[in-house]
Amino acid sequence: MSPAEREFDIVLYGATGFSGKLTAEHLAHSGSTARIALAGRSSERLRGVRMMLGPNAADWPLILADASQPLTLEAMAARAQVVLTTVGPYTRYGLPLVAACAKAGTDYADLTGELMFCRNSIDLYHKQAADTGARIILACGFDSIPSDLNVYQLYRRSVEDGTGELCDTDLVLRSFSQRWVSGGSVATYSEAMRTASSDPEARRLVTDPYTLTTDRGAEPELGAQPDFLRRPGRDLAPELAGFWTGGFVQAPFNTRIVRRSNALQEWAYGRRFRYSETMSLGKSMAAPILAAAVTGTVAGTIGLGNKYFDRLPRRLVERVTPKPGTGPSRKTQERGHYTFETYTTTTTGARYRATFAHNVDAYKSTAVLLAQSGLALALDRDRLAELRGVLTPAAAMGDALLARLPGAGVVMGTTRLS
């Protein structure tokens, strides 16, 4: 049976967790005609979520599936055109579902922020997914759609203007309000560091700027591309003169997703495309000191974690950190916001800025981005790229998301600066 003939357009797996509930809410209130089912391990909890969603979801079917029982995942994937999964940490629970979707030719989107899960998915299932026609799309939330789409916007604009390929390209987190960290986020970071610290080869891979490129020799040699940088804003763009920027905790993951997008598109961004991510720390007298402190702390914490985290007992870590399934309150989500700006210079010297902003917190935004990714895969297939395999958001559905996300409250755009 072809994906278009299947019982469901979208199955949301992990619907009873924190991110799963938020994603289900957005799907229920999206006004979409998509045929949607909720999936998870507990029928009782699934019924509770469906009831919470109200009349729009009253007839959504429920599917029992469990990451520890691969046959249930295969059965679920065979019934769906698209599977969205919020079940993490993906290093522990994700590969069986990737395998099921690759086998069935089912499109897939997740919220991973774990490099080794991404690399293992590519190594094990890229070819099979390409052969069956499946799109396995990684990192469809706050990690890494804003990063990926901002660069894609810049690429599209430079093509339209005929101003050449992208060269030095730098993302800056300009504003961010987030008052709580979810248990799922903590589990993701913990699992990523545990994986790197327990395996020297994994640790080597995650420090390579091209972790997610399997043909490493095909990538251009652009010199050192450090993840954590302390720089005055004027070094990035004249518009940032007076500001200081420092290390951004998500840079080691997002940068590699963006570089994979370039490789998947046959280096359409350019062979001299050089990409970094930082966060703005203001322009006060203390900003240079703050930038140094933040950069040192982030780099030191992740560096030490990638070497030694596996020495910490798993139970101890779980006891002192937020529990999976927990997260900020609804009021806190609505009070949050973020704005990313990405600056680039092209081979002809043209300069551009792309913006990606959302007036909710990162968790609410993540749910919106994942849900809209699912709707794009299910309903906007004429806007999707022809690529198949283990993909990135921009490479697989950049045009579809650029068309969809403004209707979901995301503000995007590009400006030519010179």
UniProtKB/Swiss-Prot annotation:
Pfam families: Sacchrp_dh_NADP. SUPFAM superfamilies: NAD(P)-binding Rossmann-fold domains. The keyword Transferase does not apply. InterPro entries: NAD(P)-bd_dom_sf, Saccharopine_DH-like_oxidrdct, Sacchrp_dh_NADP-bd. GO terms for molecular function: oxidoreductase activity. GO terms for cellular component: peptidoglycan-based cell wall; plasma membrane. Keywords: Lipid biosynthesis, Lipid metabolism, Oxidoreductase. The keyword Ion transport does not apply. It comes from the Bacteria. GO terms for biological process: DIM/DIP cell wall layer assembly; glycolipid biosynthetic process. Its EC number is 1.3.1.-. Belongs to the saccharopine dehydrogenase family. Enoyl reductase subfamily. PANTHER family: SACCHAROPINE DEHYDROGENASE-LIKE OXIDOREDUCTASE. This is Trans-acting enoyl reductase. It comes from Mycobacterium tuberculosis (strain ATCC 25618 / H37Rv).
